[in-house]
Design a protein with these regions (language model features):
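ATP-dependent carboxylate-amine ligase catalytic core
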Residues: 1-61, 73-86, 112, 116, ...
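Short, surface-exposed linear patches
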Residues: 18-20, 60-63, 90-92, 156-158
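Short coil/turn connectors at secondary-structure junctions
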Residues: 33-36, 63-66, 93-95, 129-131
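C-terminal lobe/tail of nucleotide-utilizing enzymes
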Residues: 86-159
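Structural motif
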Residues: 39-41, 68, 99
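Short amphipathic alpha-helical segments at helix-loop
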Residues: 13, 66-69
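Active-site-adjacent structural elements in enzyme catalytic cores
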Residues: 53-66, 85, 94, 98, ...
Length: 159
């Protein structure tokens, strides 16, 4: 299902005189069952509404897939990401990795933006030592440090 308005799916669907099909939401992944790896992208966080009574966490639980938590590499990233990790675990979800994404080019910062982002990732890694933490720099095609995504996915599924 695709809705035009940049609103939550329930609000956007209502604005179009439609509704979110909860069955399709949960079974749409079946079309990809022959693939080795499937990435299901969520938006808005674990507690964003996807349907009238369905939250992102509900869908993640129903699909049984490990989570990759992504946040912008900026002030507050540790708190937001740690909150998401703890919320996911409280919901019985497995977190396979955390990614800090540099969403725009580096700006001039007295302490050096690169060092701040690296320190942020290192500080989070201390707080969640069992979860790989990485950075995706603006314009980069690989993660820093590299992540073995296959291993992360398998560890998440086996938990």
């Amino acid at each position: 299902q695709v809705f035009r308005a940049p609103l939550s799916p329930p609000r956007s669907s209502r604005a179009e005189g439609r509704h979110v099909d909860d069955h399709l939401l949960r079974t749409g992944i079946e079309a990809w069952s022959g693939c080795e790896i499937v990435v299901v992208e969520g938006a808005g966080g674990l507690f964003s509404p996807l349907g009238k009574t369905t939250l992102g966490a509900d869908l993640a639980r129903d699909l049984g897939l490990p989570l990759v938590i992504v946040d912008a590499a900026r002030l507050g990233g540790i708190g937001r990401t740690l909150c998401a990790v703890r919320a996911a675990r409280a919901e019985g979800l497995c977190v396979a990795a955390c990614v800090f994404s540099q969403v725009s080019p580096a700006t001039t910062h007295p302490a050096g933006e690169e060092a701040l982002v690296q320190d942020t990732a290192a500080d989070l890694a201390v707080l969640v030592p069992d979860v790989p933490v990485t950075i995706l720099w603006h314009g980069a095609r690989s993660f820093d440090p590299p992540i073995d995504w296959w291993r992360a996915a398998m560890l998440g599924i086996s938990d």
